[in-house]
From Swiss-Prot:
Protein name as catalogued: Leucine--tRNA ligase
Catalytic activity: tRNA(Leu) + L-leucine + ATP = L-leucyl-tRNA(Leu) + AMP + diphosphate
Annotated ATP binding sites: 579
Species per Swiss-Prot/TrEMBL record: Thioalkalivibrio sulfidiphilus (strain HL-EbGR7)
Gene Ontology cellular component annotations, sorted alphabetically: cytosol
Protein family (similarity comment): Belongs to the class-I aminoacyl-tRNA synthetase family.
MF terms (GO), sorted A to Z: aminoacyl-tRNA deacylase activity; ATP binding; leucine-tRNA ligase activity
Subcellular location(s) of the protein: Cytoplasm
Family annotation (PROSITE patterns): AA_TRNA_LIGASE_I (PS00178)
Coiled coil spans: none
Motif 'HIGH' region boundaries: 42-52
This enzyme's EC code(s): 6.1.1.4
Source organism superkingdom: Bacteria
CDD domains: Anticodon_Ia_Leu_BEm, LeuRS_core
């Protein structure tokens, strides 16, 4: 065995061995219970970053550990390959997005392989390949036929220079991020999926996801946002009635105005003869509006001059256009109660609108100062005619009953969740499989004509989508009437691809169907790993898609992922690593210098997986030193020749103590990796054990036998984390087969039993010594041993022992004065 640890050569040898033996190829007929471990696949940006390395190391450690537990493990990898960055790179580097993407995939695949991740590369998929996206096109055509996909006009951010729709995050200070042109709010036709049809099931399903972090479940519950309230109508003379939804019907008698969105049809009609109102509405169209912006947006509005009729009192209520009312949320109209809603209060103060208190605090003596803020708690009704004196809860029912009897309202369960707009006016995405016919309307592309292939060899300049200028792509015939028609040139939101990729890995080569029987064999995913930033959109859409595929008879079960681990970010100097901050660390340079195992070890040791990890050069050095020490420990042991067989009955006290430490460590590491997924504490326990091994100098036959067992077990415990060095050391220790194929070592319960116990000795509650006593020692013997300790004697000298407290198996406290 060579004396020094040389990671580069031994890592390549281990990887070659795994490749030649197809170690990580998953087979449905292999022995063992299936275990599907999946890390969220990367966008092929060109280079792996440390966040990737952390995510994928966690997944690999879990996969390798489960393999050693006898499970039949599937761990695949692929590429979330469509999306905006490829278009930006195409503009910058003058290459087609496809070419840039495929080159990046090739490079990043090599980087992943160099890190030694145990992926089944036969299952690799890229979402930009037609053989992948043809099946989401097929599913979409099924959803259209079922009425679960539909087209309607929706407000978007439109860049008039780049001729494209911008996502909210691409609008910076009201201007397009690339062109700098003022962004317009436009209504354009878009495709939607009826995720709201599944809102209640998506919400209730969260209760069963006990293997998910509570934080993620809470975020999804809030995003779905179920509320119970009342939908009611305010008549507007000469116009259609205004429908509003409220969760606080108890405040109905305090309404002092109704707010409508700038895009509301009523606002448009009111502006027809009012130039100032028209100008205000136009200004609102240039304001970026998302829910997040609403909290900080300056509240602005204008009176339309129209009056709505209060559904209970019949009083006229002014109708205002307000920039904080969103057309895409609810009905685009709200009833405003300034006394009991802070946003309504701020608006009313700004424009001098009445503030009518109709709720008193339930507790007497609580002061309400409506000059300072709205009173938003529930309480008891006042100034509310026949509803006076009712509690807010009683008034909810009484007012709902009244409105229902008068046919002016109805109880309703509402969701904050909106249908998912899946159209993107971009090029680099999956074409939406629709043919637009002037006579038949939108018609799904027939199954036999799928996939609709995205042309990849295009000149891309960033102005509009190149396929909009390609008659050979657009011009076609209608499948229903045979007349001239045009293909849809919009593409799917890229969340579409990532919503079902986990299922396609199970049967990547299925040619005749989206999924086959193999999906039932592997699904659901046993362990999913990814960033908390995907808590809502990706994870919610994947849950939605699983239900869509279930309802197509493609999968069993209701949920895609049994357990979820959300790893923390990798920070440097307290900030997330990013190119813009100039604080990135290149994984490749580290691997070249220290080897993949050192990088993997540092990533797992520096922090628990759920917490952020602070980058530390000295921490990487420390991980490297530990592996060198492990190598030297095995080298020095092997130099002594083969160790004899272990004879447990022949061990002396020191040998027994080392075995006890070994099996205590094994029990802890098994729990830390297998149940708690706290890899950092597992590694710390192995390091502590290595320190004990370093101090163990017994070169007798049984001393070497215990050392052999300890080194073999340590190598196997560390093998999921540092698999390359484990591969080399396992054979150097003279063992048959490969470390990767070994079962996880088993704790010897008999080794954990001890004839002695260690007790803490305190003097007046302060730790002064630790003593070893026989496990069956009588109280008198324990007290005698405690008082005989040198350090204890120093601290009681010249004092009187008042009493001694003995807690069996734990401590002795000597009370003196």
């Amino acid at each position: 065995m060579q004396e020094h640890y040389e990671p580069d050569a031994l890592e390549r040898q281990a990887q070659t061995w795994w490749d030649e033996h197809q170690t990580f190829r998953a087979r449905e007929d292999a022995p063992g219970e299936p275990f599907y471990c999946l890390s969220m696949f990367p966008y092929p940006s060109g280079r792996l970053h440390m966040g990737h390395v952390r995510n994928y190391t966690i997944g690999d450690v879990i996969s390798r550990y489960q393999r050693m537990q006898g499970r039949n493990v599937l761990q695949p990898m692929g590429w979330d390959a469509f999306g905006l960055p490829a278009e930006n790179a195409a503009i910058k580097h003058l290459v087609p997005p496809a070419k840039w993407t495929y080159e990046n995939i090739a490079y990043m695949r090599g980087q992943l392989q160099r890190l030694g991740f145990g992926y089944d590369w036969d299952r690799e998929l890229a979402t930009c390949r037609p053989e992948y996206y043809r099946w989401e096109q097929w599913l979409f055509t099924r959803l259209v036929k079922k009425g679960l996909a539909y087209k309607k006009t929706a407000m978007v951010n439109w860049d008039p220079v780049d001729q494209t729709v911008l996502a909210n995050e691409q609008v910076i200070d009201g201007k397009g991020w690339r062109s700098g042109a003022p962004v317009e709010r436009r209504e354009i036709p878009q495709w939607f999926l009826r995720i709201t049809d599944y809102a209640e099931e998506l919400l209730k399903g969260l209760d069963g996801l006990e293997g998910w972090p509570e934080q993620v479940r809470t975020m999804q519950r809030n995003w779905i946002g179920r509320s119970e309230g009342v939908e009611l109508e305010f008549e507007v003379p000469g116009e259609a009635p205004l429908t509003v939804y409220t969760t606080r019907p108890d405040t109905l008698m305090g309404v002092s105005y109704v707010g409508v969105a700038p895009e509301h049809p009523l606002a448009a009609r009111a502006a027809e003869g009012d130039g100032k109102l028209a100008a205000f509405i136009e200004a609102c169209r240039h304001t970026k509006v998302s829910e997040a912006d609403m909290a900080t947006l300056e509240k602005k509005g204008m009176d339309t001059g129209l009056k709505a009729v209060h559904p209970v009192t019949g009083e006229p209520v002014p109708v205002w256009v307000a920039n904080f009312v969103l057309m895409e949320y609810g009905t685009g109209a709200v009833m405003a109660v300034p006394a009991h809603d802070q946003r309504d209060w701020e608006f009313a103060r700004q424009y001098g609108l009445p503030v009518r208190q109709v709720i008193l605090p339930a507790e007497e003596g609580v002061a309400v100062d409506l000059d300072q803020a709205a009173f938003t708690d529930k309480g008891v009704l006042i100034e509310s005619a026949q509803f006076n004196g009712l509690s807010s809860a009683q008034a909810f029912d009484a007012i709902a009953d009244f409105l229902e009897k008068q046919h002016k309202g109805r109880r309703r369960v509402n969701y904050r969740l909106r249908d998912w707009g899946v159209s993107r006016q971009r090029y680099w995405g999956c074409p939406i499989p629709i043919i637009n016919c002037p006579d038949c309307g939108p018609v799904p592309v027939p199954e036999e004509q799928l996939p609709v292939v995205l042309p990849e060899d295009v000149a891309f300049d960033g102005v509009g989508s190149p396929i909009k200028r390609m008659p050979e792509f657009i011009d076609t015939t209608c499948p229903e009437c045979g007349g001239k028609a045009e293909r849809e040139t919009d593409t799917f939101d890229t969340f579409f691809e990532s919503s079902w990729y986990y299922a396609r890995y199970t049967c990547k080569d299925a040619d005749g169907a989206m999924l086959d029987e193999r999906a039932r064999h592997w699904l659901p995913v046993d362990q999913y790993i990814g960033g908390i930033e995907h808590a809502v959109l990706h994870l919610l859409y994947a849950r939605f898609f699983h239900k869509l595929m279930r309802d197509e008879g493609l999968v069993d079960g209701d949920e895609p992922f049994t357990r979820l681990l959300t790893q923390g970010m990798v920070l440097k100097d307290g900030a997330k690593m990013s190119k813009s901050k100039g604080n990135t660390v290149d994984p490749e340079a580290l691997i070249e210098r220290y080897g993949a195992d050192t990088v993997r070890l540092f990533m797992m040791f520096a922090a628990p997986p759920e917490l952020s990890l602070e980058w530390s050069d000295s921490g990487v050095e420390g991980a490297y030193r530990f592996l060198k020490r492990l190598w030297k420990q095995v080298h020095d042991h092997v130099q002594g020749g083969a160790a004899p067989a272990l004879d447990k009955a022949a061990l002396n006290a020191d040998q027994q103590a080392l075995r006890r430490k070994l099996h205590q460590t094994l029990a802890k590491v098994s729990d830390d990796i297998g149940r708690r997924t706290t890899f950092n504490t597992a590694i710390a326990a192995c390091m502590e054990l290595m320190n004990e091994l370093g101090r163990f100098e017994d070169k007798s036959g049984q001393g070497r036998a215990v050392m052999q067992e300890a080194l073999e077990t340590t190598v196997l415990m560390l093998s999921p984390i540092v698999p390359h060095i484990a591969h080399a050391l396992w054979s150097e220790l003279g063992r048959e087969g490969a470390a990767v194929d070994q079962p996880w070592p088993v704790v010897d319960e008999s080794a954990l039993e001890s004839d002695t116990v260690e007790l803490v000795v305190q003097v007046n509650g302060k730790l002064r010594a630790q003593i070893q006593v026989p496990a069956a020692a009588a109280r008198a013997a324990i007290e005698e041993a405690a008082l005989a300790d040198e350090n204890v004697q120093r601290h009681i000298e010249g004092k009187t022992v008042v009493k001694m407290v003995v807690v069996p198996g734990r401590l002795v406290n000597v009370v003196v004065k």
